[in-house]
Amino acid sequence: MKKWFLALLMALMALMLSVASAENVPLASETEINPVLEAQTLVGLKIPVEAFKETTKGGEVISAEITTSETDAEVQYVNVFGYIYPVDESAPNIEWRMLLPMKWNGRSVQLGGGANNGSIPKLTGTGSVGGEIAIDKGYVVYGDDSGHQAESSMDASFASNDEALSNYTRLHLIKAYDAMCYVTNAFYGQEPVFKFFAGGSTGGREALECATTYGKYYDGIFCCEPASNYVLIRMWGAILSQAVYESYDAEKYPYSDGFIDEDTVKAIQADAVALYDGLDGIEDGIVSNIYAARANRDNFLKQITEKYGLTKAQLKTIDVYENGYTLDYAMANGMNAYHGYSALEGGAMDLGPDPVPREPLDTTYNVHHGDRADGVFKYFITKDPNWVLIDHDYYHPDQELYDMLMAASEEYDANSPEFDDFIANNGKLIYFAGWNDMSMSPWQLIQQYRGYVEKYGQEKVDSFCKFYVMPGVTHTKGIAMNYLSWLDVWCSTGEYPTETLYATMSATGGQMPMAEFPGWVKYEGGDPMDGASYSISTEIPDGFWGVYD
């Protein structure tokens, strides 16, 4: 009876906290909640169908083991593993894992996955570009495999099962969330006061799904370089592959005229860094003044064309990489363009080592985005495993392909500007891109952010979203920042941190201040390892926007 009363009391306290103003909630670092159950009592715990917002056959805890953190010997947690069972008996289970700290800060963080998922993300690390280990900070940390199991994250064959595909698209997120709430409530006697999500790439797409589709349930979200323009990015992979390989015919002409060998690609990148590195005030191998560099791209392109004897076909490949493409028709979300990358400003084009296209395309040998696009078109969009990616006209699709593209955009894209539920829930979003990301275009993510501003206005967007773009950052790599602490301050106090926020740059090991868009990091003098030696400049060449973005 005493245990029951204690659990009820703690649940009532949690409810009071949830309805209190944000200013009344202690920070994570000031909160410690202890379990009300023994860890082993979780084993065999059934999660009823009624606990899930989406249709399932319930869930179950399979194992629960007390574990000591590998990075902090004073931190102990319960490593919980479980299943969420599908309605379709031929569909895979959702496998999830949850870390429950013995000293809990009252918050949870759900970590997103990568590529086509198929495995549970690592829960004991810092996550995408993170600077903090969440379990060591007292967070409940959890994640799932997106609703199927695969040896390779590139495997898209699971999509032949409708429930598995629906789970991957978005449903696994809220199902895992519901499992977390149920298990957490059982173990601590209450749900989290604040529920966070953090992810990059596919995990970034998942982050935006949480903010838009499930915005009423999440309090703070970190979204890193999201694969949110899902159909457009996979079409970019198809169009880039065509630019590289369209001349290839194994019998008549076994050459890919658009292919650029790896040595030349690396030399172009080195030339760009050498030319633009000092524009930010310091030569440190990081191109920070991306705007001035991009405004010079026509001159730079002329230089490298002459230096390396680039052909018309090779220039087309570079054009697709740098500028993306524009369609005469729009996706279901209204977008008709993919804006390309910083390929001529120090980014690394990845065309693979081999000019011979495999079938299916293989990223070990071929264009990096080719195999990802190939799998998505085969299993997600066309449902045709014999689809040959480079054999179709994406600029002028026939009616059948057009209809499939529209249906796919409606289902898979995660670039909705509808944050009404998230805003009403007082949700907070940190949105992040890297100038050197060659997987998810920073220029495309800028366009997406502008869509938010167009819908809500800058002042309203600023109240729930901070958008940073940083130099020297590739795809979910190259930087470490304490975004969990920033989100916690924002959600707990109602105010975003007012002090200058710094991140650690992998390229130098030093710090730089976070550059809120459209700012860029400028060196002012002093110790280059000290973030205080930099400022955030908003100096942008006249006429830049609408021409070079």
Regions found by a protein language model. Give the residues of each.
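Catalytic-loop region of hydrolases
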Residues: 23-105, 120-129, 276-279, 287, ...
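Cap/lid segment of the alpha/beta-hydrolase catalytic domain
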Residues: 105, 114-189, 235, 387-402, ...
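Alpha/beta-hydrolase fold nucleophile elbow
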Residues: 190-201
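Glycine-rich nucleophile elbow surrounding the catalytic serine of serine-hydrolase chemistry
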Residues: 199-209
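Short beta-strand/loop motif that positions the catalytic acidic residue
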Residues: 430-433
